[in-house]
Amino acid sequence: MLGLVAPGALLTRVVTKVPLVVRSGEVTHVGIPWCQAGEPGRGPRAEGENMSAQSLGEQTVDLLGRLVRLGCVNDLTADSGGEERAADLLEDFFSGLPVSIERITPHPGRTSLVVTVEGADPTSAGTPLTLLGHTDVVPVDEAKWTRDPFGAQIEDDVMWGRGTVDMLHLTAAMAVVTREVARRAQDGNSPARSLVFVAAADEEARGGLGVPWIGEHRADALPWDAALSEMGGAHIRGRRGGDSVVVVVGEKGAAQRRLHIRGDAGHGSVPLGRTSAVERLSQVSAALSAARWPTATDEVWASFVRAFEFDETTETSLIHGTYEGDYSEFEDLAAFAHAISHVTVAQTVAHSGGPINVMPSHATLELDIRTLPGVDDDDVDAAIVAALGDLAEHVTIERLLCEDATASSIDTDLYRAIEAALTKRYPGASVVPVLFPGGSDLRVARRLGGIGYGFGAVDSGASLGQVYSQLHAHDEHIALADVRGTVEVLHEVATTYLTHV
């Protein structure tokens, strides 16, 4: 997706006191003074006053509904998404407040919004906090939905709609918290550290027109030192009644490969003594399926296992990589637990052959390989060769997408602020760092030298398995208790981090 960016990407920056427009590297001061809410170009004053009077939870529910109804569907093509509509909505949301706003548009319609509340002394204060949200959502099969996927319908304190879980509720919460910090700054109570909110485009397509594009082409547009994004806050219920709340501290990497498999050409009527590429492909496939791939034995995996409160034998075997079972002990998280503890190899695409009477001499097999922290591309290729044994002499490995896994330390001020807020919210619960099998924009922050955590607060008590099952699902929905809880805990984390330098 990175190759979709067209030359001359449009970048627009708006600063509340002296608006600027930046186009193709040129900076032009616009002859419009700083406007308060209700003045031309800045949205109606009544809306801003009404939003200030609402609770943080009410504001977030309202904004979430509006984002869902936009339907910024990303079908993995450059012209989909239309996230500029969300950028327009959110820019109006901050109207009249002392923030700087930059619009970054690598491709028409694919706008990411960067909103900054400056700290009291940004030149000397601690590292800023960056909130990485995204406004695009995955497509829907409307025939499989029982409600309008873009209607943001509320029933029994639950909102239904595409993106409610992934991740518009958190994006809305980030906007509301940033707005509240800006409102306080307007009243003379600026935070010690700066706060940056990003409403990014194109996350669902790995961000070729979103945060990864910004990191590659405009890394100066936002600080990468300390970031929060999606997928934390769900619960793990232990077998002895314990409660743990997860914080995502890392993500698996991608090491996609195409194997070129050589065979013997010949006429299909005389196969004796020849091995076609199709037959050899089947042998390669079987060898890969039978192989043992690297497993996790680090403390992040160990803390995840301990949260389930298994018997001592099961716990020890899982932690030390000697487990031989099917992960059924994890129940609805069996596939999740296996994925975050292994280098996984999914055989996804195979090609070979032409006329039915010709034995082909070439076949390809594509592998979607997801790696653990510390496993690099050379390790992956070596593991493939080892798995193939003698078959390796007939195979050439082509590297496709290559991204190392990323992980952040938990010995940081930001993690401690998250831990304190979550244990206050859920008395008696433990906070458990976990690796996530998928990807998010946090990988960009980590690769640029920062730390990043997947954050949330699930007041409904939904388990990690229940939350995970909602991702990209038909009839995606979220309990409004979780929306309110997320914004309230995020506000506490931000307040703690921004005021303690």
Question: Which residue ranges define each predicted feature?
Answer:
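N-terminal helical capping/dimerization or prosegment-like subdomains
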Residues: 52-142, 362-366, 377-381
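Acidic, glycine-rich active-site loops and adjacent beta-strand->loop/helix elements
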Residues: 135-137, 199-207, 230-235, 265, ...
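Short, Lys/Arg-enriched N-terminal segments with co-localized hydrophobic residues
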Residues: 35-50
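Active-site metal-coordination/substrate-binding segment of hydrolases
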Residues: 125-196, 478
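Active-site-adjacent substrate-binding region
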Residues: 285-293, 315-318, 409-459
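Acidic-enriched catalytic cores of C-N bond-cleaving enzymes acting on peptides and small amides
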Residues: 219-220, 226, 233-242, 248-256, ...
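Zn-dependent metallopeptidase/amidohydrolase metal-coordination segment
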Residues: 401-402, 428-500
